UniProtKB/Swiss-Prot annotation:
Cellular localization per UniProt: Cytoplasm
Enzyme nomenclature, EC number: 3.1.3.5
UniProt record similarity statement: Belongs to the SurE nucleotidase family.
Residue numbers binding a divalent metal cation: D8, D9, S40, N93
PANTHER family, per the entry: 5'-NUCLEOTIDASE SURE, 5'_3'-NUCLEOTIDASE SURE
GO cellular component: cytoplasm
Protein name per the record: 5'-nucleotidase SurE
Biological role stated in the UniProt entry: Nucleotidase that shows phosphatase activity on nucleoside 5'-monophosphates.
Organism whose genome encodes this protein: Actinobacillus pleuropneumoniae serotype 5b (strain L20)
Catalytic reaction list: a ribonucleoside 5'-phosphate + H2O = a ribonucleoside + phosphate
Free-text cofactor note: Binds 1 divalent metal cation per subunit.
MF-aspect GO terms: 3'-nucleotidase activity; 5'-nucleotidase activity; exopolyphosphatase activity; metal ion binding; nucleotide binding
Keyword DNA-binding in annotation: no
Lineage of the species this protein comes from: Bacteria, Pseudomonadati, Pseudomonadota, Gammaproteobacteria, Pasteurellales
InterPro entries documented for this protein: SurE (IPR030048), SurE-like_Pase/nucleotidase (IPR002828), SurE-like_sf (IPR036523)
Amino acid sequence: MNILISNDDGYHAQGIQTLAETLRDAGHSVTVIAPDRNRSAASSCLTLMEPIRVHQLDEFNYAVIAGTPADCVHLALNGFFEQSFDLVISGINHGANLGDDVVYSGTVAAALEGRHLPYPSLAISLVGRKSEGHLFGNNHFDTAAKVVLDLLPKVQKGIVPARQILNINVPDLPYEQVKGVMITRLGHRSPAAEIVKREDPRGATIYWLGANGVPVDASEGTDFYALAHNYVSVTPIQADMTAHYSIQALKDTF
């Protein structure tokens, strides 16, 4: 397959480098176009009010200067390259994209930019483990890359409809310790913690965003549940954000 890879951690990140190398070793044609720096949580932001510059690192690797993940894939699929691509893979992200994370995720946004291609895009993330409440890892990027290789033949069967993508989260474990794959729905987190107010060395007030919310819907069938039990979660998602279940109630009201 002719595969385009991007991410939100930057072209230098271990995750994207491991993924590209693994896919090339498996015989796929791989082109990497990614931000030149970490753009985590950029969501689907596009650069519209200023020009975009791209630095060619070598024949198959490109860095978008100050670009977002969505910029990268948008450029790649709309005239930057003469070639066409079969599939977009975004990742391997350094950390989870579970539940409500997908709203903010640059990893997921990059995959969504590829929704018009013949095969559903993949957003893949490596989920670090916790010890005494603290996250550590990510170490097993090779595991996540192998999971991608396992999934590609299934993706090529055309089971997933056009315009959908697969959001994939992989436990940070040796490949042999991963129990399998669960097809899941998105779970839900609580609201984020309160912002943190501080004072900089010059006396000006500054703010940090609070910590991410904790899972409040991690029941069986969710992506949170799969990861908690050492399974890979595969969740089909789409750009269509219509709340279809509310349409009739609104029609009846208006």
